[in-house]
Amino acid sequence: MGHDSFCYLIVLRCALRCGIIALMQICALQKKERRSKMESSDRSSQAKAFDETKTGVKGLVASGIKEIPAMFHTPPDTLTSLKQTAPPSQQLTIPTVDLKGGSMDLISRRSVVEKIGDAAERWGFFQVVNHGISVEVMERMKEGIRRFHEQDPEVKKRFYSRDHTRDVLYYSNIDLHTCNKAANWRDTLACYMAPDPPKLQDLPAVCGEIMMEYSKQLMTLGEFLFELLSEALGLNPNHLKDMGCAKSHIMFGQYYPPCPQPDLTLGISKHTDFSFITILLQDNIGGLQVIHDQCWVDVSPVPGALVINIGDLLQLISNDKFISAEHRVIANGSSEPRISMPCFVSTFMKPNPRIYGPIKELLSEQNPAKYRDLTITEFSNTFRSQTISHPALHHFRI
């Protein structure tokens, strides 16, 4: 055999080998695509059957299940990140600020403003005590949410809906049918409360009165917090209020039933909030975690405290001075349900036509605008979109 023929055979053999490898890769890819389509179809069927019960995750637990449905299974890489928490030696915890000094003399108020500003810049999260809402009101609010979710399912079903334009609705996983990601282990009561609150008779009977009372007190607290946050930005105390940041809020009553396999799912997946700020009332079970220095840090319940976190819209108008930190809730592995009530202070549900962008007084040659101007409608449409793979705020960066 001549040298040329030998070389030809070698080249032919290599080509055949490459062809076989390529064919194997194509077959593997096609198999993966078929499996993905089957899994997607299975998930859709599961989601449809789950949704039609109108009893949420609470209904699954009440049925006595020992294993969670596959549609709740969180991807392995996300589950691995559950272990990426701060080591005990660091003893990281979000700041706690006593608001009592904020309404006293100038020196005390300045100290409170500095603490809030530092927490908003470094953490995006902090807890507040002496905030003006009594423990009695907070306990009644938590009990009201518990009673709603644990009442007769036939009564709850009257509020069940996926129409987020309604003022009052109950659901489990609002995006259940709009994306293929794993469902979360929780149920939600959502109520639009300000500036045009629903009529008392339109709210659930078991918690309507306390929701109205709690909402009014939250409005007062929210306005006070925006004064302190304005001052922390070096602005007039009324600046953020004059921008309409405090005018609107929606309250969620979150119910996290005990999960038989808490290591396989989440209570809420990693996300940022769409609000200017969020005011959270939580019970003593815990489960909320926030990203800080690339570690997950537990937001441990503090008796009588409320958790405050900066939302995307405040990060935008502060031009990244304050941060909207990613956070999540791990699945409830305790024997009791976890109750929490976030109040999103934002015009997200009923947007106004106002244009929002980085506050001009905060900009300079050294600190140019990092975001383009936008309307709340534009932001909310992006926030709800399932086509983006990163926080909605990134979409508006210049």
UniProtKB/Swiss-Prot annotation:
Its cofactor is Fe(2+). Its EC number is 1.14.-.-. 2-oxoglutarate binds at residue 338. GO terms for biological process: biosynthetic process. Keywords: Iron, Metal-binding, Oxidoreductase. Expressed in etiolated seedlings, leaves, stems and flowers. InterPro entries: DIOX_N (IPR026992), IPNS-like_FE2OG_OXY (IPR044861), IPNS-like_sf (IPR027443), Oxoglu/Fe-dep_dioxygenase_dom (IPR005123). Residues 247-347 form the Fe2OG dioxygenase domain. This is 1-aminocyclopropane-1-carboxylate oxidase homolog 5. It comes from Arabidopsis thaliana. The gene is 2A6.
